[in-house]
Design a protein with these regions (language model features):
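Conserved functional hotspot residues or short segments at active or partner-binding sites
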Residues: 206-213, 217-410
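Generic secondary-structure boundary signal with a strong preference for alpha-helix termini
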Residues: 23, 107-108, 124, 183, ...
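Cleft-lining beta-strand/loop regions that shape enzyme active-site pockets
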Residues: 1-187, 198, 382
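Short, intrinsically disordered/low-complexity patches at protein termini
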Residues: 50-51, 79, 122, 140, ...
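Residues in well-ordered beta-strands of folded domains
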Residues: 17, 32, 57, 116, ...
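Polar, glycine-rich mid-to-C-terminal structural blocks
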Residues: 153, 165, 172, 176-238, ...
């Protein structure tokens, strides 16, 4: 209901009464409606000690984003002719328009280069997509960052760069979405999505990870088994596999969800503390240099006192599962006392857990606080301070011998 009242034509305005969450003071704000446009390039900059790396973060493959990336890279190269290489960040990018994936590949490779093929049961669904234009720079060193949430068009770009040995892929294995879906119109304005084909990268491999053709007995879908995966070769003869997304050339550890951090986010405590912090700090340091102080973290821990948030550690979850099995198999009564002792030993202390996970909690607090002052661009800028994948990319691009070796050049 509130959304309906707030929405309207660009240029019109409305008034809203707001209450400060901390002082409870009320005020009336006048807001002018505007057409909101969200860029698929949330952060582009020259990074590194001497601004020698062109960093481009692409959040989604939207209309004309290929040209936007081309212009961004070109601008960074002109600003610093001594640029050592490009870092194309496709982490958390769910994909989008296939044509734009081809256009982005075309920035770094020649025209008439195969990027992706689609193959279906009917020949009408078989298509070949090639680059059509002139590259911006086909020799400039390139790294592509991916993670488990890089999917579809992101995987096509990363897979193409890997298959033709054009760039080094860094991060974690990608999602593995290699299915082409076609939308069919139905009655009553309804639509039906039908899987009609699969994507294949230049080496001939399919990146699809989930095997919908061999469901489990309960109907669930599992990943394609290793026995069904095939080997393929890149342009330089490196071995790559199908059936499981894109495996990076340099693997970095994935971040597992931390129970206490998840609990804090579920209750919006990190978000709320950032708002509280901003209400008492008119300004902060520049986004690139801002760090949460020890006293600020101590204040956050104190602020959490008495607040309701609960969670189970992985050890506690495993113990519960063990108890369930022991009860079913009639072993539990015999080990009940020992079980209780282990349970007591594993019981967690919230303050201790906060200190154990201090680094990640501070990271997330910084994200939220910086966003209050410098918005999403500031958040990305601050995150680059301790981004392990970006550091690895800069290291590779700074070492031509290692870069060439990773690509299988002889």
């Amino acid at each position: 209901e509130i959304g309906k009242l707030i929405k309207g034509s660009p240029g019109t305005s409305f008034k809203v009464k707001v209450r400060d969450a901390f002082t409870l003071a009320e005020s009336v704000k006048s807001i002018t409606r505007e057409e909101i446009s969200i860029s698929s390039l949330p952060y582009v900059d020259a990074i590194g000690p001497n601004k020698e790396f062109a960093y481009v973060r692409l959040s989604q493959f939207t209309d004309r984003c290929g040209n936007m990336v081309r212009v961004a890279v070109d601008s960074l190269l002109k600003a610093n002719p001594k640029t050592k290489g490009v870092i194309l960040d496709l982490r958390f990018n769910p994909g989008g328009l296939l044509d734009e994936a081809v256009n982005i590949c075309n920035i770094f490779i020649n025209g008439d280069q195969l990027v992706v093929t689609t193959k279906g049961k009917n020949e009408e669904w078989d298509k070949t997509y090639k680059t059509r234009g002139t590259p911006l720079d086909e020799k400039l060193p390139l790294t592509v960052l991916i993670n488990r949430r890089s999917a579809s068009a992101s995987e096509i770009v990363a897979g193409t760069m890997q298959d033709i040995d054009r760039g080094v892929v860094i991060g974690q294995r990608s999602f593995g979405k290699g299915l082409v879906q076609t939308t069919r119109e139905l009655a009553f304005n309804a639509k039906l999505k039908v899987t009609t084909a699969k994507y294949y990268t230049p080496s001939g491999r399919c990146i699809q990870a989930l095997d919908y053709t061999h469901r489990n007995e309960d109907g669930s879908v599992g990943e394609i088994s290793d026995s069904l995966k095939s080997k393929f070769k890149t342009k330089n003869g490196r071995i790559v596999m199908d059936g499981g997304g894109i495996e990076p050339d340099i693997k970095t550890p994935s971040k597992e969800a931390i129970k206490i951090v998840t609990a804090l986010n579920d209750k919006d405590y990190i978000f709320d503390y950032a708002t509280k912090y901003a209400s008492t700090h008119p300004t902060i340091a520049a986004a690139k240099t801002f760090t949460l102080s020890e006293s600020d973290f101590a204040d956050f821990v104190k602020w959490l006192e008495g607040k309701d948030y609960s969670y189970q550690t992985k050890a506690e979850e495993a113990l519960d599962k063990f108890k369930e099995v022991a009860v079913k198999e009639n072993y539990f009564e015999a080990i009940k006392n020992d079980f209780t002792q282990v349970q007591k030993s594993l019981s967690h202390d919230k303050t201790q857990d906060l200190m154990k996970n201090k680094k990640e909690i501070i990271r997330q607090l910084q994200d939220e606080i910086v966003t209050r002052y410098y918005f999403s661009r500031g958040r990305y800028e601050n995150q680059l301070q301790d981004d392990e994948e970006v550091k690895e990319a800069m290291s590779v691009l700074s070492n031509p011998t290692r870069y060439s070796s990773l690509l299988g050049n002889k």
